[in-house]
Amino acid sequence: MQSFLQEVAADLYRRYGEDVSSLHILFPTRRARHFFIDALSHLAERPMWQPRWLTIDDLMQEVSGLHSGERIRLIAELYKVYSACHDEPFDKFYFWGEMLLNDFDTIDKYRVDADALFRNIYELKELESDVSYLTAEQLEVIRQFWANFTDGATLSEEKRRFLAVWRTLGDVYHGFRARLQRQGIAYGGMMQRAAAERLLAGDFAFAERRRYVVAGFNALSACEKVLFRFLQHNAETDFYWDYDDYYLKNTDQEAGMFVRENHASFPPVVELSHDNFRKEKELTVVSTPSNAVQCKYAGRILDALRTGADGRKRPLDKETAVVLTDENLLLPLLHALPEEAGGINVTMGYPIKTTLAYAFLERLVELQAHRREGREGTSFYHVDAAGILAHPYVARSAPQTIEQLRRTMLADRRIRMTADELGQTPLLKTLFTPAAEWRELSDYLLRAVAAVAREPYDGDDARQRVEFLAVISEQLIRLRNSLEACDIEITTSIYTSLLRRHLQTVRIPFEGEPLEGLQVMGILETRNLDFRNVVLLSMNDDNFPGNRVAQASFIPYNLRAAFDLPTPAHHEGVYAYYFYRLVQRAERVYMLYCAHADEKTTGEQSHYIYQLDFETGFRLKRVEVGVDVNLAENPPIEVAKEGDVWEKLSRFVDPESPAMLSPTAFFRYVACPLRFYFYSVARLKADDDLTEEVDAPMFG
């Protein structure tokens, strides 16, 4: 198998030799660079300089002269413009302000006439604004959603306020762009549009002669097409397209939707191999009852791939990839990989939201959210306090003190405990300090994280603990700086919401060599890369391709289609290309899906699997995996009636002994002798739960 990047490297080296180092190369992903350099290193006869690497964003920024702004700051600037037209607090604006920013971004990337689009939206909403048929309950939902309606508003007033939002979208859009332009920052779409307009006006030229290589792109926005035309006519540019004739020449195949246009508009400098779908492939479809079984079975597949023709096991190399269409399966998959698999390169990073450090931060946030101020000072809710005390980062710091606090809480039935009662050590005093305003909460979280990081810790995850806490501390500072740059007052609740949303997207990169061992990656990272063996997980139709076109948008579907904005059909074409491009050079492809249907999934395999089965002529091997119900037997617990045990039992039948069997103990003995032993002989009792209501045992 010769990969796409190997073919590109071979052609460039054949044509330019060591002058390849003078080229400016654009790939869709940064990871493609590593594989390209590896391919080039096998061709070069002596050491040479690398080519110059660029991304589309780098070029757009160079041409436009604008810089990308932090997302939180962009939404804050959008709010300042929006609030001039509508009286709405930032807390309520933020989350649908994100939706508005996404729409503006899409409008600019596709160079849509914003005034015409917003005028159409307003007219469409005016037709839809007759609310006379709505029930009182439905009207109440509308009032709560917009937060603009008052209980005493008339129907016509509701209609007026409803339409006012849509009428001002154009003004907000233009005002927002002008405000950002004055500050020299932009969102992605605005930067692309500014660059495209400058190129079309002839106001930009490169300061020096450049030769570009554009390789492996697929779906292009209108602004990106303008950039590529500029490179085509104003710089020496070589285009390479990664496709197969199977879907390029078949106009009914959605995988070729974009590459057909690209191939015609930007002809390739040379034709590479495009007949890989004619080659023999081993395609296997695996139906599993759960995601956990998917991961386990993927481990078995990888173990089988390690076995060579001579029967010996060998480590897996970069020719094998596990592709996660649902990145939530990363951790279960890592636990299911065979220990002898060799090196593993994970491209997606470790999600911070699954770490103990993030759980600790959540405990702190909940602790402050439920605190109360009273005559005795600040008090904390027992559930939050107990959670902090039980967390591994805290429990090992002063085990005796913490155990005594826990016992006091249970024995005295303390629903709330004061900060003075809980702050028995320097660490606990730091953790149980009140923080009201959002800046105080931010400072408090930073102090708490730093205090925990300084504590001695002898757990197996000591190194990871410090790294995770350092990442959280860094993200807290970044969020604080972004919010202060916005110059907008927010509530503590909106701060905690922003903090959660921010941290849940943070991933910690794994350390490793990208060109060694098994490759574990998401579907987007596979662009331009080819593998001999591919294992695809979560190949359910509602997940892959699914429907990732944002449902929350001000732009309805019919107007998206009319103005050539991305629609579900666009999304379908993009993901069909990802799939078929990944399969085209592979020799073995395993497609696993969960056949279990519930409220979240239909259990249906991806329609791409059906297409392979009925349209390509390949024979698909199908495997159904069940659940192993042969559970390991637990040995029975037996306690011999001898020695000390017999002496304790004899007390209950000795007429001179004060020990007696209560009715409850006798019933327990009849129901389960072992339970009787634990309660009445060994005196083992579970800790009482701290209840907030008077239950039957407490009432008597």
Describe every region a protein language model picked out.
Residues M1-N558, G617-R622, D688, E692, ...:
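Nucleic acid-machinery interaction/catalytic patches
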Residues D238, T284, G343, F360, ...:
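Generic structural signal for residues positioned in beta-strands
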Residues N540-N543, A597-E599, R683-K685:
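Short, surface-exposed beta-strand-loop junctions and turns on beta-sheet-rich folds
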Residues Y393, P566-T616:
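C-terminal accessory regions
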Residues A552-P568, R581:
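Active-site rim segments in enzyme catalytic domains, especially the processed small/beta chain
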